[in-house]
Amino acid sequence: MGLRFKKVLNMNIAKIMIPKICTVVLHERSTIRQGLEVLAHCHYTAIPVLDAEEHYVGSVTEGDFLRHIIKTGTTDMKEQEKYSVRDILRRDFCPALSIEAEFDVVVDASLRQNFVPVVDSRNALCGIVTRRSLIAEIAASKK
């Protein structure tokens, strides 16, 4: 194993994470309509969800929104304003890792999740690690 790659394995998550300020998030009080609009605009398949204190509480996916639309039986956006993201939130989907987590733990999580939410000791979202950011860092270490 090359010296540069060993450095990647010892890397701090903060170096490869996309900071919260650059991350698309929803708040659990956002309406389903707002969530659908964000998904349509950003073309993501899953988005982290925060509470009022900016703590990470889970993630929602396109499928969560589709299941909700089927359950309510309407695609009327005015009607979807009656429901909040909290109603469809999956708290166990995309579990977060601590900013202190080891690099190999991040790699393992990225094999199961499209993105890995990164939180501080208060469970406040610091940012996310995507598969793309992870691969880019590994590729850069090979140069």
Predicted regions and their residues:
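Bateman (tandem CBS) regulatory domains
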Residues: 10-23, 81-93
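Short beta-to-alpha loop/turn elements within the nucleotide-binding domains of ABC transporters
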Residues: 11, 30, 60, 83, ...
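A short, polar/charged loop-to-alpha-helix boundary motif
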Residues: 64-80, 134-143
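A glycine-centered beta-loop-beta connector
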Residues: 39-42, 47-64, 110, 118-133
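Short, low-complexity N-terminal regulatory "tails/caps" that precede and couple sensory modules
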Residues: 1-8
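The conserved cystathionine-beta-synthase
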Residues: 25-43, 50, 95-113, 119-122, ...
